[in-house]
């Protein structure tokens, strides 16, 4: 079977004083994101050794779904609310799914 899922890791460094506000805004966005038809999974993880570092693991059903995600009201709200909380610009890396098979998501 052809693999079509797109996995995006978004790396975020937050100001220490913004950790709780970032977590709250990001969890609200994640909960809404998993309801999008193009989103297979949306995980939020925080570094065990540095609470200011987060990774958002976003799994999209196809290459067009990230653009659709960025048009949603909840994403727009998230982006605006966390902008001042960032210690540095966020970065991202795109991956193609290898395992499990797309049907396993």
Where are these regions (language model features)?
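N-terminal first-folded block
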Residues: 6-36, 40, 44
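An amphipathic, aromatic/His-enriched active-site/gating alpha helix that lines ligand/cofactor pockets
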Residues: 27-40, 59-93
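Short alpha-helical
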Residues: 17, 28, 51, 73, ...
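Short, well-ordered beta-strand segments in beta-rich or mixed alpha/beta enzyme
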Residues: 6-13, 43-70
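Non-catalytic surface loops within mature trypsin-like serine protease
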Residues: 14-16, 62, 96-98
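Glycine-rich beta-strand-turn "strand-cap" elements at beta-sheet edges
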Residues: 1-6, 44-52, 80-105
